[in-house]
Protein backbone atom coordinates (compact mmCIF):
# COMPACT_ATOMS: atom_id res chain seq x y z
CA UNK A 1 0.00 0.00 0.00
CA UNK A 2 1.41 3.42 -0.92
CA UNK A 3 1.75 6.15 1.69
CA UNK A 4 -1.07 8.21 0.13
CA UNK A 5 -3.33 5.19 -0.16
CA UNK A 6 -2.66 4.28 3.45
CA UNK A 7 -3.50 7.77 4.61
CA UNK A 8 -6.75 7.63 2.66
CA UNK A 9 -7.57 4.34 4.36
CA UNK A 10 -6.77 5.76 7.77
CA UNK A 11 -8.93 8.76 7.02
CA UNK A 12 -11.88 6.42 6.43
CA UNK A 13 -11.00 4.45 9.57
CA UNK A 14 -10.11 1.26 7.73
CA UNK A 15 -6.92 -0.39 6.54
CA UNK A 16 -5.99 -3.86 5.49
CA UNK A 17 -5.84 -6.20 8.46
CA UNK A 18 -7.19 -3.77 11.06
CA UNK A 19 -9.97 -4.87 13.37
CA UNK A 20 -11.58 -1.59 14.34
CA UNK A 21 -12.67 -0.75 17.85
CA UNK A 22 -15.05 2.17 17.71
CA UNK A 23 -14.08 5.46 19.30
CA UNK A 24 -15.60 6.31 22.65
CA UNK A 25 -18.07 9.06 23.36
CA UNK A 26 -15.46 11.84 23.15
CA UNK A 27 -15.07 10.80 19.48
CA UNK A 28 -11.84 12.60 18.75
CA UNK A 29 -8.53 13.81 20.07
CA UNK A 30 -7.87 17.42 19.11
CA UNK A 31 -4.84 19.66 19.71
CA UNK A 32 -4.88 21.96 22.73
CA UNK A 33 -6.75 25.24 22.14
CA UNK A 34 -4.54 27.74 20.33
CA UNK A 35 -1.88 25.21 19.29
CA UNK A 36 -2.90 25.05 15.64
CA UNK A 37 -3.05 28.84 15.41
CA UNK A 38 0.66 29.18 16.27
CA UNK A 39 1.83 26.28 14.09
CA UNK A 40 3.85 27.24 11.02
CA UNK A 41 2.45 26.61 7.56
CA UNK A 42 4.98 23.83 6.95
CA UNK A 43 4.09 22.13 10.22
CA UNK A 44 0.38 22.44 9.52
CA UNK A 45 0.86 20.80 6.13
CA UNK A 46 2.74 17.97 7.81
CA UNK A 47 0.04 17.50 10.44
CA UNK A 48 -2.63 17.27 7.76
CA UNK A 49 -0.77 14.67 5.70
CA UNK A 50 0.89 12.52 8.38
CA UNK A 51 -1.18 10.90 11.15
CA UNK A 52 1.97 10.10 13.13
CA UNK A 53 2.97 13.77 13.15
CA UNK A 54 -0.54 14.58 14.40
CA UNK A 55 -0.10 11.92 17.12
CA UNK A 56 3.11 13.64 18.21
CA UNK A 57 1.50 17.08 18.18
CA UNK A 58 -1.44 16.19 20.45
CA UNK A 59 0.47 14.51 23.28
CA UNK A 60 -1.07 16.67 26.00
CA UNK A 61 -4.60 15.89 24.80
CA UNK A 62 -3.65 12.21 24.46
CA UNK A 63 -2.28 12.02 28.02
CA UNK A 64 -5.33 13.77 29.43
CA UNK A 65 -7.53 11.24 27.64
CA UNK A 66 -5.50 8.30 29.00
CA UNK A 67 -6.01 9.69 32.51
CA UNK A 68 -9.77 9.85 31.88
CA UNK A 69 -10.04 6.38 30.35
CA UNK A 70 -8.23 4.73 33.26
CA UNK A 71 -9.60 6.98 36.00
CA UNK A 72 -11.14 4.00 37.80
CA UNK A 73 -7.68 2.41 38.19
CA UNK A 74 -5.61 5.44 39.17
CA UNK A 75 -6.03 5.10 42.92
CA UNK A 76 -4.40 1.66 42.93
CA UNK A 77 -1.52 2.41 40.55
CA UNK A 78 1.94 3.34 41.88
CA UNK A 79 3.44 6.66 40.88
CA UNK A 80 6.39 6.28 38.50
CA UNK A 81 8.89 8.49 36.77
CA UNK A 82 7.46 8.89 33.26
CA UNK A 83 9.09 9.62 29.95
CA UNK A 84 5.86 11.49 29.22
CA UNK A 85 5.90 11.14 25.42
CA UNK A 86 7.27 7.66 24.76
CA UNK A 87 6.88 6.75 21.10
CA UNK A 88 8.76 5.01 18.31
CA UNK A 89 10.25 8.20 16.85
CA UNK A 90 11.79 9.09 20.22
CA UNK A 91 14.29 6.27 19.62
CA UNK A 92 17.69 7.84 18.97
CA UNK A 93 21.33 6.82 18.72
CA UNK A 94 24.75 8.36 19.24
CA UNK A 95 28.14 6.82 18.62
CA UNK A 96 28.06 5.10 22.02
CA UNK A 97 24.42 4.82 23.15
CA UNK A 98 20.86 4.25 22.01
CA UNK A 99 17.35 4.43 23.43
CA UNK A 100 14.31 6.64 23.94
CA UNK A 101 15.27 10.29 24.28
CA UNK A 102 13.63 13.73 24.52
CA UNK A 103 12.24 14.14 28.04
CA UNK A 104 10.41 17.46 27.59
CA UNK A 105 7.18 15.97 29.00
CA UNK A 106 8.73 13.84 31.74
CA UNK A 107 6.73 13.89 34.96
CA UNK A 108 5.54 11.61 37.74
CA UNK A 109 2.34 9.64 37.26
CA UNK A 110 1.00 6.12 36.58
CA UNK A 111 3.27 3.99 34.39
CA UNK A 112 0.44 3.11 32.02
CA UNK A 113 0.71 6.67 30.60
CA UNK A 114 4.00 5.67 28.97
CA UNK A 115 2.79 2.17 28.12
CA UNK A 116 -0.34 3.33 26.28
CA UNK A 117 1.60 6.07 24.48
CA UNK A 118 4.23 3.67 23.16
CA UNK A 119 1.66 1.05 22.14
CA UNK A 120 -0.28 3.75 20.29
CA UNK A 121 2.85 4.63 18.34
CA UNK A 122 3.35 0.96 17.45
CA UNK A 123 -0.20 0.79 16.12
CA UNK A 124 0.32 3.83 13.89
CA UNK A 125 3.71 2.53 12.75
CA UNK A 126 2.31 -0.84 11.66
CA UNK A 127 -0.49 0.86 9.76
CA UNK A 128 2.00 3.04 7.93
CA UNK A 129 4.26 0.06 7.20
CA UNK A 130 1.37 -2.24 6.21
CA UNK A 131 2.37 -4.62 9.03
CA UNK A 132 -0.97 -4.73 10.84
CA UNK A 133 -1.03 -8.57 11.07
CA UNK A 134 2.02 -8.24 13.37
CA UNK A 135 0.50 -5.64 15.70
CA UNK A 136 -0.35 -8.00 18.58
CA UNK A 137 3.06 -9.67 18.30
CA UNK A 138 4.72 -6.25 18.54
CA UNK A 139 2.60 -5.41 21.58
CA UNK A 140 3.77 -8.74 23.04
CA UNK A 141 7.42 -7.77 22.51
CA UNK A 142 6.96 -4.45 24.30
CA UNK A 143 5.30 -6.14 27.28
CA UNK A 144 7.99 -8.84 27.35
CA UNK A 145 10.65 -6.16 27.66
CA UNK A 146 8.70 -4.24 30.28
CA UNK A 147 8.06 -7.32 32.43
CA UNK A 148 11.68 -8.43 32.06
CA UNK A 149 12.90 -5.06 33.33
CA UNK A 150 10.49 -5.01 36.27
CA UNK A 151 11.71 -8.45 37.31
CA UNK A 152 15.40 -7.79 36.55
CA UNK A 153 16.01 -4.03 36.32
CA UNK A 154 19.74 -4.43 35.66
CA UNK A 155 19.39 -7.06 32.92
CA UNK A 156 19.55 -4.64 29.96
CA UNK A 157 18.61 -5.53 26.40
CA UNK A 158 20.49 -6.46 23.22
CA UNK A 159 21.34 -3.72 20.76
CA UNK A 160 18.60 -3.45 18.11
CA UNK A 161 19.87 -4.17 14.62
CA UNK A 162 18.81 -0.76 13.35
CA UNK A 163 21.28 1.02 15.65
CA UNK A 164 24.29 0.38 13.41
CA UNK A 165 22.17 1.23 10.37
CA UNK A 166 21.28 4.63 11.85
CA UNK A 167 24.86 5.30 12.88
CA UNK A 168 26.00 4.71 9.31
CA UNK A 169 23.52 7.26 7.92
CA UNK A 170 25.43 10.26 6.59
CA UNK A 171 28.01 10.65 9.38
CA UNK A 172 28.98 14.32 9.81
CA UNK A 173 32.31 15.88 10.68
CA UNK A 174 32.24 18.34 13.58
CA UNK A 175 32.82 21.18 11.11
CA UNK A 176 29.81 20.10 9.04
CA UNK A 177 27.75 19.68 12.21
CA UNK A 178 28.56 23.21 13.40
CA UNK A 179 27.82 24.66 9.96
CA UNK A 180 24.49 22.83 9.85
CA UNK A 181 23.63 24.16 13.31
CA UNK A 182 24.35 27.75 12.33
CA UNK A 183 22.09 27.34 9.30
CA UNK A 184 19.25 26.44 11.69
CA UNK A 185 19.67 29.65 13.71
CA UNK A 186 17.13 32.36 12.90
CA UNK A 187 17.92 36.03 13.66
CA UNK A 188 17.45 37.49 17.15
CA UNK A 189 17.46 41.15 18.15
CA UNK A 190 20.50 42.55 19.94
CA UNK A 191 18.48 42.85 23.13
CA UNK A 192 17.51 39.19 22.93
CA UNK A 193 21.09 38.08 22.31
CA UNK A 194 22.14 40.13 25.34
CA UNK A 195 19.53 38.36 27.46
CA UNK A 196 20.79 34.98 26.24
CA UNK A 197 24.39 35.91 27.09
CA UNK A 198 23.37 36.91 30.63
CA UNK A 199 21.34 33.74 31.01
CA UNK A 200 24.21 31.54 29.88
CA UNK A 201 26.53 33.23 32.37
CA UNK A 202 24.14 32.17 35.13
CA UNK A 203 23.94 28.65 33.68
CA UNK A 204 27.74 28.49 33.57
CA UNK A 205 28.02 29.21 37.29
CA UNK A 206 25.60 26.39 38.06
CA UNK A 207 27.26 23.87 35.72
CA UNK A 208 30.79 24.70 36.90
CA UNK A 209 29.66 23.91 40.45
CA UNK A 210 28.74 20.39 39.32
CA UNK A 211 31.45 19.95 36.66
CA UNK A 212 34.52 21.88 37.87
CA UNK A 213 36.71 20.09 35.32
CA UNK A 214 35.19 22.10 32.45
CA UNK A 215 37.74 24.65 31.20
CA UNK A 216 37.26 28.42 31.69
CA UNK A 217 35.37 30.08 28.87
CA UNK A 218 33.47 26.90 27.97
CA UNK A 219 30.15 28.78 27.82
CA UNK A 220 31.40 31.82 25.91
CA UNK A 221 28.80 32.46 23.19
CA UNK A 222 29.93 32.66 19.57
CA UNK A 223 26.47 32.89 18.04
CA UNK A 224 22.81 32.33 18.94
CA UNK A 225 19.49 32.27 17.11
CA UNK A 226 15.91 31.11 17.32
CA UNK A 227 15.40 27.43 16.52
CA UNK A 228 12.30 26.17 14.70
CA UNK A 229 12.39 22.40 15.00
CA UNK A 230 10.17 19.68 16.42
CA UNK A 231 6.60 18.49 16.17
CA UNK A 232 5.31 17.95 19.69
CA UNK A 233 7.52 20.80 20.93
CA UNK A 234 6.88 23.06 17.94
CA UNK A 235 5.02 25.66 20.00
CA UNK A 236 7.81 25.93 22.61
CA UNK A 237 10.36 28.73 22.38
CA UNK A 238 13.78 27.29 21.47
CA UNK A 239 17.19 28.91 21.04
CA UNK A 240 20.27 27.29 19.50
CA UNK A 241 23.59 28.56 20.83
CA UNK A 242 27.15 27.98 19.65
CA UNK A 243 29.57 28.10 22.58
CA UNK A 244 33.35 27.96 22.84
CA UNK A 245 33.57 24.47 24.31
CA UNK A 246 36.86 22.91 25.45
CA UNK A 247 39.19 25.48 23.83
CA UNK A 248 39.18 28.84 22.01
CA UNK A 249 39.70 26.99 18.72
CA UNK A 250 36.46 27.05 16.66
CA UNK A 251 36.94 23.41 15.61
CA UNK A 252 35.79 22.09 19.00
CA UNK A 253 32.92 24.50 19.60
CA UNK A 254 29.70 23.01 21.00
CA UNK A 255 26.04 23.50 20.15
CA UNK A 256 23.57 23.77 23.02
CA UNK A 257 19.81 24.11 22.81
CA UNK A 258 17.82 26.22 25.26
CA UNK A 259 14.19 25.17 25.38
CA UNK A 260 11.10 26.49 27.12
CA UNK A 261 9.31 24.02 29.41
CA UNK A 262 5.62 23.58 28.67
CA UNK A 263 3.19 23.47 31.57
CA UNK A 264 1.59 20.12 32.40
CA UNK A 265 -0.87 21.70 34.83
CA UNK A 266 -4.37 20.35 34.28
CA UNK A 267 -3.46 16.81 33.23
CA UNK A 268 -5.41 14.96 35.91
CA UNK A 269 -3.26 11.92 36.69
CA UNK A 270 0.15 13.63 36.78
CA UNK A 271 1.69 14.89 40.01
CA UNK A 272 1.50 18.63 40.56
CA UNK A 273 4.50 20.53 39.22
CA UNK A 274 7.09 21.87 41.63
CA UNK A 275 8.10 25.51 41.83
CA UNK A 276 10.84 24.58 39.33
CA UNK A 277 9.14 22.74 36.44
CA UNK A 278 12.49 22.30 34.69
CA UNK A 279 13.47 19.80 37.37
CA UNK A 280 11.00 17.24 36.02
CA UNK A 281 12.81 17.34 32.65
CA UNK A 282 16.28 17.09 34.20
CA UNK A 283 15.26 14.24 36.53
CA UNK A 284 13.52 12.37 33.72
CA UNK A 285 16.57 12.57 31.47
CA UNK A 286 18.92 11.49 34.25
CA UNK A 287 16.76 8.68 35.60
CA UNK A 288 15.34 7.22 32.38
CA UNK A 289 17.72 8.41 29.69
CA UNK A 290 20.57 6.39 28.22
CA UNK A 291 22.01 9.17 26.06
CA UNK A 292 24.10 11.36 28.36
CA UNK A 293 24.75 14.88 27.06
CA UNK A 294 27.80 16.79 28.27
CA UNK A 295 25.61 19.66 29.43
CA UNK A 296 22.14 19.26 30.96
CA UNK A 297 20.99 22.07 33.22
CA UNK A 298 18.12 24.34 34.23
CA UNK A 299 18.26 27.99 33.22
CA UNK A 300 17.35 31.26 35.00
CA UNK A 301 14.54 33.55 33.91
CA UNK A 302 15.22 35.25 30.58
CA UNK A 303 13.65 38.60 29.73
CA UNK A 304 13.54 38.39 25.93
CA UNK A 305 11.49 41.01 24.05
CA UNK A 306 10.10 38.57 21.47
CA UNK A 307 8.91 36.22 24.22
CA UNK A 308 7.51 39.03 26.35
CA UNK A 309 5.47 40.06 23.32
CA UNK A 310 3.66 36.73 23.67
CA UNK A 311 2.64 37.71 27.20
CA UNK A 312 5.19 36.05 29.48
CA UNK A 313 8.93 35.92 30.25
CA UNK A 314 10.97 32.85 29.44
CA UNK A 315 10.93 31.75 33.07
CA UNK A 316 11.19 27.98 32.86
CA UNK A 317 13.78 26.72 30.40
CA UNK A 318 16.64 24.29 30.30
CA UNK A 319 19.68 23.62 28.15
CA UNK A 320 21.18 20.51 26.65
CA UNK A 321 24.28 20.06 24.53
CA UNK A 322 23.96 18.44 21.11
CA UNK A 323 26.05 15.46 20.01
CA UNK A 324 27.31 15.48 16.39
CA UNK A 325 26.61 11.74 16.16
CA UNK A 326 22.99 12.06 17.35
CA UNK A 327 20.41 10.56 14.99
CA UNK A 328 16.67 10.15 15.61
CA UNK A 329 14.66 7.33 14.11
CA UNK A 330 11.94 8.14 11.61
CA UNK A 331 9.27 5.63 10.63
CA UNK A 332 10.74 5.61 7.13
CA UNK A 333 14.00 4.23 8.61
CA UNK A 334 12.28 0.98 9.62
CA UNK A 335 13.44 -1.69 7.18
CA UNK A 336 11.18 -4.47 8.42
CA UNK A 337 8.77 -5.43 11.15
CA UNK A 338 11.77 -7.05 12.89
CA UNK A 339 13.31 -3.59 13.38
CA UNK A 340 10.11 -2.44 15.05
CA UNK A 341 9.96 -5.58 17.22
CA UNK A 342 13.49 -5.01 18.50
CA UNK A 343 12.78 -1.35 19.26
CA UNK A 344 9.53 -2.29 21.04
CA UNK A 345 11.36 -4.76 23.30
CA UNK A 346 14.18 -2.31 23.97
CA UNK A 347 11.76 0.50 24.83
CA UNK A 348 9.87 -1.82 27.18
CA UNK A 349 13.12 -2.62 28.98
CA UNK A 350 14.14 1.04 29.23
CA UNK A 351 10.79 2.20 30.58
CA UNK A 352 10.25 -0.76 32.88
CA UNK A 353 13.72 -0.74 34.43
CA UNK A 354 13.61 2.81 35.71
CA UNK A 355 9.97 3.86 35.90
CA UNK A 356 9.47 2.70 39.49
CA UNK A 357 12.70 4.15 40.86
CA UNK A 358 11.71 6.43 43.73
CA UNK A 359 13.00 9.91 44.48
CA UNK A 360 15.90 8.48 46.51
CA UNK A 361 16.99 6.18 43.67
CA UNK A 362 15.67 2.97 45.25
CA UNK A 363 14.12 0.19 43.14
CA UNK A 364 12.10 -1.56 45.83
CA UNK A 365 11.43 -5.20 44.92
CA UNK A 366 7.97 -5.21 46.50
CA UNK A 367 6.90 -2.22 44.39
CA UNK A 368 8.13 -3.95 41.24
CA UNK A 369 6.29 -7.14 42.20
CA UNK A 370 3.03 -5.24 42.67
CA UNK A 371 3.56 -3.45 39.36
CA UNK A 372 4.02 -6.79 37.59
CA UNK A 373 0.77 -8.09 39.07
CA UNK A 374 -1.15 -4.97 38.04
CA UNK A 375 0.33 -5.09 34.56
CA UNK A 376 -0.81 -8.68 34.13
CA UNK A 377 -4.32 -7.81 35.31
CA UNK A 378 -4.64 -4.74 33.09
CA UNK A 379 -2.76 -5.83 29.98
CA UNK A 380 -5.78 -6.82 27.88
CA UNK A 381 -7.61 -3.63 28.76
CA UNK A 382 -4.50 -1.53 28.01
CA UNK A 383 -4.28 -3.07 24.54
CA UNK A 384 -7.96 -2.54 23.78
CA UNK A 385 -8.09 1.02 25.08
CA UNK A 386 -4.96 1.91 23.11
CA UNK A 387 -6.65 0.88 19.87
CA UNK A 388 -9.77 2.81 20.80
CA UNK A 389 -7.70 5.91 21.53
CA UNK A 390 -5.98 5.63 18.15
CA UNK A 391 -9.39 5.57 16.47
CA UNK A 392 -10.33 8.73 18.39
CA UNK A 393 -7.05 10.28 17.30
CA UNK A 394 -7.71 9.47 13.64
CA UNK A 395 -11.14 11.08 13.83
CA UNK A 396 -9.48 14.26 15.10
CA UNK A 397 -6.81 14.02 12.40
CA UNK A 398 -9.49 13.66 9.71
CA UNK A 399 -11.21 16.78 11.05
CA UNK A 400 -7.96 18.74 10.69
CA UNK A 401 -7.55 17.54 7.11
CA UNK A 402 -10.89 19.04 6.09
CA UNK A 403 -10.40 22.73 5.16
Which ranges hold each PLM region?
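Bacterial N-terminal signal peptides that target proteins for export
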Residues: 1-11
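Bacterial N-terminal signal peptides
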Residues: 9-21
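Intrinsic-disorder/low-complexity coil detector
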Residues: 22, 30-32, 186
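Conserved ATP-binding subdomain of kinase catalytic cores across diverse folds
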Residues: 28-43, 49-83, 88-167, 214-403
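Sequence-structural signature of the catalytic-core scaffold of metal-dependent phosphohydrolases
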Residues: 152-208
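Short N-terminal edge-element motif at the start of the domain
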Residues: 206-216
